[in-house]
């Protein structure tokens, strides 16, 4: 498993490998720096995970629902591409509530796939998009893999998960899951790769 808890050691994940001569060898991820030389290039996916999982209720019935934010479609209109659960009960025209004071409300305006929906958030704080995003993300949780959420007694992420489920070089917001290989890079390993006099490039 790539990620279990805050006790997870990012760079100590190990794998049984076979060397060039066909001999079995056990390596930890942090050993990767031993295979790079001066002049080599590290390419990092610097996409930053945002708190994409929201929990709320459906209008009238107060049924519990889950919304997984995928991407913002239109900032001015507050449109988001999302996945929903339970999909069969969330239809066009339904309103979804995400807080106790009904400030963060979304209306379903389109079905995109069996679980996919387009939501329009009915939130207006003087038209300030940054305030809206901060308020929306404050209600969200770290988008941990489902097998981790299901294994927890309360089925929720913690505040610490947002840091643990993030690559140390993450910079540009937009990911709903951390790049798997990048999760293994610890800050110490990042420093070691820099000391190799290798070049670093990023993609988002």
What are the roles of these predicted feature ranges?
Residues 198-204:
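Serine residues within intrinsically disordered or low-complexity segments
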Residues 3-198:
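A cross-family signal for N-terminal binding/gating loops and helix N-caps
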């Amino acid at each position: 498993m790539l990620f279990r808890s805050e006790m997870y050691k990012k760079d100590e994940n190990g794998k049984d490998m076979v060397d060039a001569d066909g001999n079995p060898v056990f390596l930890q991820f942090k050993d990767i720096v031993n295979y790079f030389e001066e002049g080599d290039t590290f390419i990092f996916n610097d996409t930053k995970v945002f708190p994409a999982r929201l929990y709320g209720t459906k209008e009238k019935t107060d049924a519990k629902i889950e919304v997984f934010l995928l991407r913002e479609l239109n900032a001015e209109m507050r449109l988001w591409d999302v996945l929903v659960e339970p999909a069969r009960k969330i239809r066009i025209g339904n309103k979804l509530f995400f807080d106790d004071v009904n400030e963060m409300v979304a209306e379903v305006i389109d079905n995109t796939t069996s679980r996919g929906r387009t939501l329009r958030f009915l939130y207006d704080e003087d038209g300030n998009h940054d305030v809206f995003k901060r308020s929306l993300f404050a209600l969200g949780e770290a988008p941990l893999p489902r097998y981790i959420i299901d294994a927890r007694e309360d089925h929720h992420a913690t505040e610490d998960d947002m840091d643990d489920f993030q690559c140390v070089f993450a910079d540009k917001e937009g990911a709903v899951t951390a790049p798997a290989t990048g999760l293994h890079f610890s800050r110490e390993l990042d420093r070691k790769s820099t000391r190799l006099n290798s070049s670093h490039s990023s993609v988002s």
